[in-house]
Each structure stands twice: as structure tokens, then as C-alpha cells.
Amino acid sequence: MRAKVRILNIRSGHFDVFINPKDAQEWKLHPNDLVKIESGKRSIYGSVVIGDFVESGEVGLSLDILDAYQFSEGELVSITPSETPESVRYIKKKMRGEKLRKVEIETIVRDIVDRKLRNTEISALVTAIEVNGLDMDEIAALTIAMAETGDMLDIDRKPIMDVHSIGGVPGNKTNIIVVPIVAAAGLTIPKTSSRAITSAAGTADVVEVFTNVTLSLDEIKRIVEKIGACLVWGGALNLAPADDLTIHVERRLSLDPRGLMLASIMSKKYAIGSQYILIDIPTGKGAKVETMEEARSLAKDFIELGKKLGQYVEVAITYGGQPIGYTVGPALEAKEALETLMTGKGPGSLVEKALGLAGILLEMGGVAPRGMGKKVAREILESGKAYEKIKEIIEEQGGDPNIKPEDIPIGDKTYTIHAQTSGYVTGIDNKAITAIAREAGAPEDKGAGVKLHVKVGEKVKEGDPLFTIHAESESRLDKAIILARRLEPIKIEGMVLQVLGNL
């Protein structure tokens, strides 16, 4: 079957192939059938959508396909119905609770990347892993397969360090301080980060306030070979592409199987050649991991997986019961991070965590004796060496190295919530703070977010400011104010909690 390509201005998040009803009947195609589109050495798989989007003799390709494959308007292609992929049989095997062999896992991952597996089959895979789990051999095979089906970064400058936080705590701009400290010590740390998905700001969103984060692999290699570090958006790269497709399904199912989470994180580390990896697991009420028992179990899995991958992994279990620093939102966090790097001083929760993590990396990389890493990291921060390194990173990635905190625009539509009673701050709800910042417009509106005026344990008087909401529009500010009043994210109590006596 042959047809001319018609490029449609449609983006669905899927590889959709649009067929005219007359052709579909003649070719015996049905909605959601899997077909192979070929032209020369190029081939893609897509799901059939039948409709009058195209004329008879045409095949419509969505923009999703054009993002990944180059087809031209009017190009003649062949269309072939595809049989059920062999990987479906392996998914059924996992649904029965059986262990998958390495070659079976590789086939599944390849079929996900080639779009032979659609969301229905990927959903079955995710559910099977949620119910039956993966052992460490399966997770290691999955991690390597996910990495090797995408691009791989080859950096000559060794050793290659990496740090990753599993997230869940608002205001976590820690790595913007950790990376320049580690690089200033002479180690190599090519840091790829994500944008916010459910948070108010991913590291990439924050860094983008003062420099470009969308770079190619060649650009990253050049920068890292030259200055030892980068802070870029991993989503602009073809690193572990199967991961993005499975994550999309996981979110829709509200599932996060541990085996997939481990493979998701470590596949990207494997792809960029990381040799020494520090995993940060924030733990506490409102964080992704709420108990020490769960944190230790997860840490053990990361370390064991690292051994199987030939990577040395250490894990830091950190306090995650309240936001890090005083700011939540891209521009607010960028301002706070830059101030800390410039002055060598900043909020205790931010500085101490950054120095603690950087110190561990310095010890892992052999540039600081065991037990002395934090001290060395502090010297690098306070001496201004880390600030000079962040300036290099900013400049190499296309930003202004002389940018100052006061140059960063913050949302000028503001509203401050005040204490309704006197007492002590006994809790700050991470999820509520994140929700308010997002309602104000973060992360899309860079200047939107929340600035805290108090932290847990501090004494407040009635009328004292608790936090200020920043927005770029009055409408977003109004919505955030309504949400803030409903959620009441900061809890204040007196020191006397209850009085008992004789009845």
C-alpha cells in the first residue's frame, strides 16, 4: 500500500497515522491498528486514526512523528499492517509474575522506543511491575537497555561525578550550589536536570532564569571538557527515551513502581557516563519518602543497583519536612541561589544541605579526606571559587556571567499572609506551599512563587508576616490567595498544647 505524506498540524502525544475511510476499508485497517510507515531506510510505527483529515491516497502524520523522524510533504511512503510485537508476550509473562530474561527486557524497551508498543501495552507493563515487582537483575537489565536505546555522552575528563535528588521538597535549589563547588574542586560533574512536573520549579526551570539550559550533546561535551561542569535540561536530550514514555503512563495510572523509578534515575546517569553518584533522599512529613525505614530500604536498592552497573553510589538521607531555604518558584529560587553563591552565606537549611552533599562528593572524588569534605566545600563557597565557577557555567551556556540577584525580575503582584495568633511555627505543609506557588503561576510564570518569612521552630506574634505570594498577573494572584486561605500551610501553636485537671 502506497500513499503520499500529508503533514497535519496535530500534536496528540502519540504517533498517530491518519487514514482516509475509503483507504482504510480497502486496506482492511481499523482504528488503533499498528502500521509501519516506510520510505527508504526510514521506518516508523504508528496507530491508525480513521477520518476525513486526509484525502484518499494520502497518509496524515502528526507533529509528534515529525519531531522524531524527517518526512516531507508529498513524499511517497509504503504502509504495512504490523503484527502484534513479540514484546507483548513478554509483558504477559511479567503479568504472570515470572522473571524476565535480559533479552526479553531489551526487546520490550526497544519496542517502546520504536513505538511498536502503545499506551495500552505500556500500561499493562507498568501495572505488572507494580503488582509483581522486578528483582535487581531485571532492574539492572532495564536500566542498561533504557540507556543504550538513546544517546550516550562520552566525556574524556574523569572522574565523572553526579548528584540526584528524588525530589518532593519545595525550594530545592541545592544542586545549583553543589555543582559549582564540586567543579571548582577540580572534579567533573555534567548535571542534567528536569523541569517541574508536579512541583513549582525543577532545577532546569531555576537555572533557565539566568542562562540557557537547552543544549545538544556536542555542546555539553564541549562545555564539560572545558570547565568541568554544566547545568542543563535533560529533556532536550535523547537520554533514555523509553523512560519518558513509561513515565507518561505511570502518571496517568498514579503508579510509581520502585523498579521503574530506580531504572528511570539510574539509566540517565548511565547514559552520561557517571562513575560516582550521590543520591539525595529527602525524608519527612510531606516528602516523597516519609519514614527512615522506607528511606533506608530505597538507599540499599540504589547502592545495590549501582554495583551491578559498575557505578559507585552513596546515599544521603536528608531532612525533607519543610521547604529548603525561603523561596519556592523559578526566579525566587534563582535569586536566593545566586545570592548564596555570591556572598558565601544564605539560609541555613540551604547552605548546610548544599555543603553536606558537596562534601560527600568531594570525598567520593578523592579531593577531600573522609570526614573533611564539608569543611573543604565550605572553604570553596566562602572563598568565592564556587561563584566564579557558576559564572563560567552561565557564560558557557549562553547567559550573562555578571548577572546579579537584583537583575532577576520577580512577580510584582504580591500578597502577604499574616499570623492570626501568636505562638511557634510547628509545621509547614510542603504540598500546600507547592500548590499555592503553582496556583500563582509557577513554573510557567518564572516570577511567580512563594517567599517564606518563617521556618519551623520560630516564634511569631499575631500579625507577623508568614509568607508572601508573588504572581505576574492579578488573576493568578487572586486564585493563589484563595487557595492559601483554604490550605493554611503554616501551622502555629502555643507551647502549652493541652490542660488537664480534676472534673
From Swiss-Prot:
EC annotation from Swiss-Prot or TrEMBL: 2.4.2.57
GO BP: any one term: AMP catabolic process
Binding site residues for AMP: 168, 194-199, 203, 264, 288
Active site: 256 (proton donor)
Family annotation (Pfam families): Glycos_trans_3N, Glycos_transf_3, PYNP_C
Class of this enzyme: transferase
Entry-linked Gene3D superfamilies: 1.20.970.50, 2.40.40.20, Nucleoside phosphorylase/phosphoribosyltransferase catalytic domain, Pyrimidine nucleoside phosphorylase-like, C-terminal domain
Listed GO CC annotations: cytosol
Keywords linked to the UniProt accession: Glycosyltransferase, Transferase
UniProt-recorded Gene Ontology molecular function terms: 1,4-alpha-oligoglucan phosphorylase activity; AMP binding; pentosyltransferase activity
Keyword Transferase attributed: yes
Catalysed reaction equations from the record: AMP + phosphate = alpha-D-ribose 1,5-bisphosphate + adenine; CMP + phosphate = cytosine + alpha-D-ribose 1,5-bisphosphate; UMP + phosphate = alpha-D-ribose 1,5-bisphosphate + uracil
Family indicated by similarity: Belongs to the thymidine/pyrimidine-nucleoside phosphorylase family. Type 2 subfamily.
HAMAP family recorded: AMP_phosphorylase (MF_02132)
Classification via NCBIfam families: AMP_phos (TIGR03327), ARCH_P_rylase (TIGR02645), PRK04350.1 (NF003338)
Function of the protein: Catalyzes the conversion of AMP and phosphate to adenine and ribose 1,5-bisphosphate (R15P). Exhibits phosphorylase activity toward CMP and UMP in addition to AMP. Functions in an archaeal AMP degradation pathway, together with R15P isomerase and RubisCO.
Descriptive protein name: AMP phosphorylase
Source organism (scientific name): Pyrococcus abyssi (strain GE5 / Orsay)
Name of the encoding gene: deoA
